[in-house]
Amino acid sequence: MSKLFFCCLILAGSFCSFRSLPIIVPSKGSLRLSESALDFGDLKSWDDETRLLRNLPMFVDKEAERDAEDIFSKEGFGLDAYNMDDKEELFDKHPRISLLSRLQSKDRKQFKKRAGNLSECFWKYCV
């Protein structure tokens, strides 16, 4: 009975995903763009490569002048602005977070293999 339920659930999920796809009706016309939308003019007149090569040193010089410390200090993200002690004090005082930190697994003892009888152990749990 549960297998039938899961099969129905999988089928319903696949039909919902198919239902979200757009339906294409051929009578409404084609989905292609018109020729005027694809007209970019004479591409040879753009001459992008020479314009890019001509302006590339200007872009590189501007980026080289900007130092990482300048970027962080302008936006208020200085390296000295982050103080870990303040964050820890704030989080330790909150009752929910301090309760969760006590329940975390980092305080649990690590598993140690016994050198004695292996029949007392199953996988990593020893009796």
UniProtKB/Swiss-Prot annotation:
Q: Does the keyword Secreted apply?
A: yes
State the tissue distribution: Central nervous system. Spinal cord.
- Organism name: Pelophylax ridibundus (Marsh frog)
Q: Does the keyword Signal apply?
A: yes
Tell me the Gene Ontology biological-process terms attached to this UniProt entry.
Answer: blood vessel diameter maintenance; regulation of blood pressure
**By its UniProt entry, which InterPro entries does this protein fall under?**
Urotensin_II (IPR001483)
Say which family it is in. Belongs to the urotensin-2 family.
Q: What role does it play?
A: Involved in smooth muscle stimulating and ion mobilizing activities. It has a suggested role as a corticotropin-releasing factor.
Would you tell me the protein name for this molecule?
Answer: Urotensin-2
Q: Which gene encodes it?
A: UTS2
Which keywords label this protein? Cleavage on pair of basic residues, Disulfide bond, Hormone, Secreted, Signal
